[in-house]
Amino acid sequence: MSKVIILGSGAAPGVPSLAYGFGDCDPKEEKNIRLRSGTYMEISGVKLLIDTSPDLRMQLILSNIRDVDAVFYTHAHADHLHGIDDLREINRITGRAIELFASPENLSVIRTRFPYLIVEKGEDVDPVYRAALHPNAFEYEKSFYFRELKVTPIKLQGHNVECSGYIFNDGEVVHISDFRDI
């Protein structure tokens, strides 16, 4: 049985936003306070995140998540990526590296923005002092396994940057975001 927790579903600035507040949303409705995009899943014994929003620390605290095996990135916009540094806390708790999966284009952006977080496999690093994220690039439409989890990355169309969707275990769970066409 899969477990899926939506950590955030708000737009890039979150809801309420600094500029527009709640907009058309009712501020009295608790569900209208929305953190930025993020999803946690447990599938086939794998604990994974989709994206790391700037709200990641609070998302993990509020959902009592203290272990992550892998992170799958949809794209390299700040609202989906810039909480990546908070993964150091997971490294400290578990004492091990986290696998990071992204398209070659998005992985290149991550390496450029956050070089201090990337550790090549086999490199000896103490995760208490430094994050340990192992980079893994994939090809679209080519399935691969991470442990017992089958992953098929798909390229989404219509966003202003390359965006990835994921099919897990032949459709047991599918995650897509920020797209206009598939």
Regions found by a protein language model. Name each.
Residues M1-V174, R180-I182:
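Binuclear metal-dependent hydrolase catalytic cores
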